[in-house]
């Protein structure tokens, strides 16, 4: 896992159209706004989270964020535990995101 800032996250999103953007917040947080093209995968729904992660293509790039950057660290560690190596964590989380927001 590599911790990255907003600028680096945005650059990776723009340069890697195949990258998977994971929002690991709750559905209510998701409803308040999200990063474009993100998929919701609530870390607190641990069984579903793990089931989905195990189905992921291990060769893709995964960009992960939560509200403040804490849950996403745990989510990144889970991705790595199943053999995914190309994992990036948005350190400031969604609260620090300064890019486009979908609501």
Regions found by a protein language model. Give the residues of each.
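Short, surface-exposed ligand- or partner-binding patches at beta-edge/loop junctions that are enriched
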Residues: 65
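Rhodanese-like catalytic fold shared by cysteine-dependent sulfurtransferases
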Residues: 1-19, 27-61, 70-103
């Amino acid at each position: 896992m590599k911790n990255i800032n907003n600028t680096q996250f945005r650059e990776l999103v723009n340069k890697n159209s195949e990258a998977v953007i994971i929002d690991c917040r709750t559905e209510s947080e998701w409803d308040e706004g999200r990063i474009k093209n993100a998929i919701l995968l609530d870390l607190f729904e641990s069984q579903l989270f793990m089931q989905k992660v195990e189905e992921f293509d291990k060769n893709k790039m995964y960009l992960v964020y939560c509200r403040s950057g804490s849950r996403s660290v745990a989510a990144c560690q889970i991705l790595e535990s199943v053999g995914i190596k190309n994992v990036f964590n948005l350190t400031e989380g969604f609260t620090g995101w300064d890019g486009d927001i979908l609501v």
